[in-house]
Structures are given as structure tokens and as C-alpha cells.
């Protein structure tokens, strides 16, 4: 993991960052409908497939890798790792696991299945210990679909990393649709960036050839 510190004085987002981080602290969320028909038709497992696709786009663009590290420094990680929740039916609680990114889905899926098998029965909130600092959070609420979803973080105005929440899939017009809520910090991510993310995610799902 490499964390490249940002020189704010020469940063082209300096005035935007200062405005939305300090003057008018602002986070926002957007909920979109993602066509996942291709995922189902390819026989891919939905949750790890979406983790893989989301991570691919997150790691493509610096605005989703910009963060304040544990030393309070502003910078950009060279790679982000998905941290995701799993549900425990017996206690109706959840745990967070994390799986390192791989360039191909088959390798990522193998590591995901290894992690869920090894740590899936650990009922602690941190199911897989020693999470690195360069993680981003993903969760799924498969019991209900939604048109809007918002996280209210009391101390979240210094948290720059995006958060993703998925809901229950629905079928509409011969397509399988997944609701996806994306929460970002306006200091590092504008409407253009989040829309580009959504468009590239949808394109990646459609065009990717996956060998299972």
C-alpha cells in the first residue's frame, strides 16, 4: 500500500476541498438502478461480483481513493480494498470482512470464498481482523429494494472515502435491477465524478467477459 500525500497548495481541488471540507462541510448520496442482468446470465454470484466491479471502478479514479490517513494527512492511496458485511441469521447481527483486490474475477472470487469460509462464523463486528487502513465499505440489504438511502454520520465530515449500499433486486422490463446507494464527500467528489462512476460501472458489468 502506498499513500501519496497531497500538496494542497498545488492541488487543483484546493479551493473546492477547503469549501466543502471546512467552510461548508458537505457529504451527499445518490441512489441509482444498476442493470445486473448480465451478472445473472453469466451465472456469477451477485455479492462478490458487485464487490469486484465496484472495486475496479474505485481503483480507476483518484477521487475515490482520496482520504485522510491515520496520521491526519491528506493524500491518495494507490489501491483500495473492499470491506463488506455478512449477515448472521442466528443472532440477526453482521460482521465485516475484507478481501484484497485481484485483477481477474476468478482469483478474487476464490479469495472471497476463502475469507467467508474462514471468518464467516465469527460473530464479532470485525469478522476478519487486522483490516488495512485503505479499505472502503460496502454492504447489502437484500430484504427490501429502495429508491433512496442515506447514511447520517455524526462525525463523518472528515471521512472522504465512498460508501456503497445495495438493496434487493427487482425484475423490470425483462431486466434485473439492483438499487445502489453511493455516499461521497463533496470535498473530493463532485456530481460529475459520481455519475462517471455509475456509467463506468454499468458498462463494466455489460462488457466484461468472465471465465468461471
Curated annotation (Swiss-Prot):
Keywords noted in UniProt: Acyltransferase, Antibiotic resistance, Transferase
Active site: 186
General function of this protein: This enzyme is an effector of chloramphenicol resistance in bacteria.
Keyword Acyltransferase: yes
A single GO molecular function term of this UniProt record: chloramphenicol O-acetyltransferase activity
Domain of life of the native organism: Bacteria
NCBIfam families: chloram_CatA
Name of protein: Chloramphenicol acetyltransferase
SMART domains the record matches: CAT (SM01059)
UniProt record similarity statement: Belongs to the chloramphenicol acetyltransferase family.
Amino acid at each position: 500500500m502506498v499513500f501519496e500525500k497531497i500538496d494542497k497548495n498545488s492541488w487543483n481541488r484546493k479551493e473546492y476541498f477547503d469549501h466543502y471540507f471546512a467552510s461548508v462541510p458537505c457529504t451527499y448520496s445518490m441512489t441509482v438502478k444498476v442493470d445486473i442482468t448480465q451478472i445473472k446470465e453469466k451465472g456469477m454470484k451477485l455479492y462478490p461480483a458487485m464487490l469486484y466491479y465496484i472495486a475496479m471502478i474505485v481503483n480507476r479514479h483518484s477521487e475515490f481513493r482520496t482520504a485522510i490517513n491515520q496520521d491526519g494527512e491528506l493524500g491518495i492511496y494507490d489501491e483500495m480494498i473492499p470491506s463488506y458485511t455478512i449477515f448472521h441469521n442466528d443472532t440477526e447481527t453482521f460482521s465485516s470482512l475484507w478481501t484484497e483486490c485481484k485483477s481477474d474475477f476468478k482469483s478474487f472470487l476464490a479469495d472471497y470464498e476463502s475469507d467467508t469460509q474462514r471468518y464467516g462464523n465469527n460473530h464479532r463486528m470485525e469478522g476478519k481482523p487486522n483490516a488495512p487502513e485503505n479499505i472502503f465499505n460496502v454492504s447489502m440489504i437484500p430484504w427490501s429494494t429502495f429508491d433512496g438511502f442515506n447514511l447520517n454520520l455524526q462525525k463523518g465530515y472528515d471521512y472522504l472515502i465512498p460508501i456503497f449500499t445495495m438493496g434487493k433486486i427487482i425484475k423490470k422490463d425483462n431486466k434485473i435491477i439492483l438499487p445502489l446507494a453511493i455516499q461521497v464527500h463533496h470535498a473530493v467528489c463532485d456530481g460529475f465524478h459520481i455519475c462517471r462512476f455509475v456509467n463506468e460501472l454499468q458498462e463494466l458489468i455489460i462488457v466484461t467477459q468472465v471465465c468461471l
